[in-house]
From Swiss-Prot:
Organism lineage: Eukaryota, Fungi, Dikarya, Ascomycota, Pezizomycotina
EC number(s) from the headed UniProt entry: 3.4.17.-
UniProt remark on cofactor binding: Binds 2 Zn(2+) ions per subunit.
Keywords: Glycoprotein, Hydrolase, Metal-binding, Protease, Secreted, Signal, Zinc
Gene3D superfamilies assigned: 3.30.70.360, Zn peptidases
Family assignment from sequence similarity: Belongs to the peptidase M20A family.
Descriptive protein name: Probable carboxypeptidase TRV_02791
Active site per the UniProt annotation: E207
Residues bearing glycans: N98, N395
Molecular functions per Gene Ontology: metal ion binding; peptidase activity
Binding site for Zn(2+) 2: D175
Species whose genome carries this gene: Trichophyton verrucosum (strain HKI 0517)
One CC-aspect GO term: extracellular region
N-terminal signal peptide: 1-22
Residues noted as binding Zn(2+) 1 in the record, renumbered to the chain: D175, E208
Length: 460
């Protein structure tokens, strides 16, 4: 891991020597004699000349500080709970650009959600000089979902090559290393032009698995409350997000009684009892509140549920003793505690309708069960998150995914929160995670616009 990020840093710094005239890096295409929108030398290449095509695509990446930084970040594996290597690389990179960098260690969780002390993974908080409490902060996460997918380049039409159409693929290319790279370069550009208006960078771990990185920052001295604008990075297709749905998660655990499958009446199948419960749970977002369903709203649409995992039993010839299901709820309205009440009532009603003497209890999942059916709610729960979207020139949308925004406690009045980034969430966790050079570079311009608007607020 150490060698990987050191190699990436050396390669990236070497590429930056192409133009060391200032701290702001040239974002214009490398001129190799082509027209404004294509490279003639590549347009004449036989489409089957893969080696030459790859070489020219590599040149495009190496010629840009943004694209080179993005590549270096993506090439370092940083699956949640294992972000140390990419964190070390990013710290060294920011040091080399004259940022003051603070490392904030983040604990791991045990099964109860209590922190386990460790010095392995860490957040990164960077700022210029002694300006530890800037008014503007850019923040993204440096962890990714599994599995790791290596960085690669391709082009849909090699015979009519355009640099902006180069497709950059790999885990984290979109979520969230595109935003990390853009935010770093946007901050450097801003500080070169406006050194009197400091800007901070916060890169956190663990966003994909509960948000402990942001929670750690939020509860620390670094969350000074002196900021007036926070710009969060996530894939939004370069739209400003006016808000996102809330989140509730829960596990259902059914305890049955094992028996020989030839004599099922001698036991009680946990799987058979789970099925009507899940059928009822699955429809909670589709029925009105008056009929026991979960709320909807004009802004966010209907609440959705996903039964993401289910298991039960040990063999076809054994009546199942245990069954487990995990469910994620994206709340479109209402309080998460009210949603939990609705969910619990639905589970209890379905269970007792199937078997009158069924006992349903809320549990922490760790103690000896006190009922036939346990409902275990996750530690993370929050309602809808409304976000600012008042900067001209952007499309405005809402999203269904969760972010670190609710994990950051805001101190002070009139703090603007923006959510923006290049790439689409539709590929973010998939095997086809990717974005084009054009999308990444346009994302940088959007961040520059948001930073400029934030700087205007500071001047006023």
């Amino acid at each position: 891991m150490q060698k990987t990020y050191l190699w990436a840093l050396v390669s990236l710094l070497a590429s930056s020597l192409v133009d060391a005239r200032s701290a702001v890096f040239d974002q214009t295409p490398l001129d190799i004699g082509g027209s404004d929108d294509s490279f003639d030398s590549i347009a004449r290449i036989d489409p089957n000349s893969n080696d030459l095509l790859k070489s020219e695509m590599d040149k495009v990446i190496a010629s840009s500080e943004l694209l080179s930084l993005h590549r270096a970040l993506v090439e370092i594996k940083s699956i949640s709970d294992n972000e140390q290597a990419v964190g070390g690389f990013l710290m060294d990179y920011l040091y080399s650009k004259n940022f003051t960098v603070e490392k904030q260690f983040v604990d791991y969780d045990d099964p109860t959600g209590k922190p386990i002390r460790t010095n392995r993974r860490f957040n990164i908080y960077a700022y210029p000089g002694n300006s530890a409490s800037p008014g503007i902060i850019l923040t993204s996460h440096i962890d990714t979902v599994p599995p790791f997918i290596p960085y690669s380049l391709s082009h849909p039409e090699p015979a009519s090559f355009k640099r902006e159409d180069i497709l950059i693929s790999g885990r984290g290319t979109v979520d969230d290393k595109a935003s990390v790279a853009c935010q770093v370069i946007a901050a450097m550009d801003h500080l070169e032009k406006h050194p009197d208006i400091p800007i901070g960078l916060l890169f956190v771990v663990s966003e994909e698995v509960g948000g402990r990185g942001m929670s750690t920052f939020s509860n620390s001295r670094l969350n000074s409350g002196t900021y007036h604008t926070i710009i969060f990075g996530e894939p939004t297709e370069r739209a400003l997000v006016a808000g996102h749905k809330g989140m509730v998660s829960f596990t259902i655990r059914v305890h049955g009684k094992p028996a020989h499958s030839g004599y099922p009446w001698l036991g009680r199948s946990a799987v058979s009892e789970m099925l009507p419960i899940l059928t009822e749970v699955d429809r909670l977002g589709d029925i009105p509140v008056s009929q026991g369903g979960l709320p909807s709203s004009e802004k966010y649409g209907r609440t959705t549920l996903n039964i993401g995992f289910m298991s039960g039993g040990v063999a076809a010839n054994v009546v199942a003793e245990e069954a487990v299901a995990n469910v994620a709820v994206r709340l479109a309205a209402g309080d998460p505690e009210d949603a939990k009440d609705i969910i619990f009532r639905a589970i209890r009603n379905a269970a007792t309708k199937h078997r009158k003497d069924a006992t349903v209890v809320i549990s922490n999942g760790l103690e000896r069960p006190k009922g036939d059916i346990e409902v275990i709610f996750g530690l993370e729960a929050y309602g809808v998150v409304d976000i600012d979207a008042d900067v001209d020139g952007f499309n405005v949308t809402t999203v269904n995914y969760g972010t670190d925004i609710p994990h950051w406690k805001i101190y002070g009045d009139n703090v603007k929160r923006y959510l923006y980034g290049p790439g689409t969430i539709f590929v973010a966790h998939g095997k086809n995670e990717a974005l084009t050079v054009g999308e990444l570079e346009a994302g940088l311009e959007g961040y520059k616009t948001l930073v400029a608007k934030a700087a205007e607020r500071e001047r006023s």
